[in-house]
Amino acid sequence: MPFLDIQKRFGLNIDRWLTIQSAEQPYKMAGRCHAFEKEWIECAHGIGYTRAEKECKIEYDDFVECLLRQKTMRRAGTIRKQRDKLIKEGKYTPPPHHIGKGEPRP
């Protein structure tokens, strides 16, 4: 027990907010991946770690993708490479405001 337990004194539970997004949040705003985490926890609850690894893999993968956005970033990189390739070949010209030559806005 810490000498000054500030979290308890102010009625805060920051540890729970940081570990489980499904927990009650300070401003009643659900986390970005709240729905995916909730599905995963509901699936894995009560069946044990070994079974949960196999049976809840889809829910867990969705949750991890929401947190890390690896597939999304990989897809954005592929799209950017394709765009650069088309620009180099002369088959695509980006709009002026995408290359910094558009009209200045207030």
UniProtKB/Swiss-Prot annotation:
<dbReference type="GO" id="GO:0005743">
    <property type="term" value="C:mitochondrial inner membrane"/>
</dbReference>
<dbReference type="GO" id="GO:0005739">
    <property type="term" value="C:mitochondrion"/>
</dbReference>
<feature type="short sequence motif" description="Cx9C motif 2">
    <location>
        <begin position="56"/>
        <end position="66"/>
    </location>
</feature>
<feature type="region of interest" description="Disordered">
    <location>
        <begin position="84"/>
        <end position="106"/>
    </location>
</feature>
<keyword id="KW-0249">Electron transport</keyword>
<comment type="function">
    <text>Accessory subunit of the mitochondrial membrane respiratory chain NADH dehydrogenase (Complex I), that is believed not to be involved in catalysis. Complex I functions in the transfer of electrons from NADH to the respiratory chain. The immediate electron acceptor for the enzyme is believed to be ubiquinone.</text>
</comment>
<feature type="disulfide bond">
    <location>
        <begin position="33"/>
        <end position="66"/>
    </location>
</feature>
<dbReference type="InterPro" id="IPR019342">
    <property type="entry name" value="NADH_UbQ_OxRdtase_FeS-su5"/>
</dbReference>
<dbReference type="GO" id="GO:0032981">
    <property type="term" value="P:mitochondrial respiratory chain complex I assembly"/>
</dbReference>
<dbReference type="GO" id="GO:0045271">
    <property type="term" value="C:respiratory chain complex I"/>
</dbReference>
<dbReference type="Pfam" id="PF10200">
    <property type="entry name" value="Ndufs5"/>
</dbReference>
<feature type="short sequence motif" description="Cx9C motif 1">
    <location>
        <begin position="33"/>
        <end position="43"/>
    </location>
</feature>
<comment type="similarity">
    <text>Belongs to the complex I NDUFS5 subunit family.</text>
</comment>
<keyword id="KW-0679">Respiratory chain</keyword>
<keyword id="KW-0999">Mitochondrion inner membrane</keyword>
<dbReference type="GO" id="GO:0005758">
    <property type="term" value="C:mitochondrial intermembrane space"/>
</dbReference>
<keyword id="KW-0472">Membrane</keyword>
<protein>
    <recommendedName>
        <fullName>NADH dehydrogenase [ubiquinone] iron-sulfur protein 5</fullName>
    </recommendedName>
</protein>
<keyword id="KW-1015">Disulfide bond</keyword>
<keyword id="KW-0496">Mitochondrion</keyword>
<comment type="subunit">
    <text>Mammalian complex I is composed of 45 different subunits. This is a component of the iron-sulfur (IP) fragment of the enzyme.</text>
</comment>
<feature type="domain" description="CHCH">
    <location>
        <begin position="30"/>
        <end position="74"/>
    </location>
</feature>
<keyword id="KW-0813">Transport</keyword>
<feature type="disulfide bond">
    <location>
        <begin position="43"/>
        <end position="56"/>
    </location>
</feature>
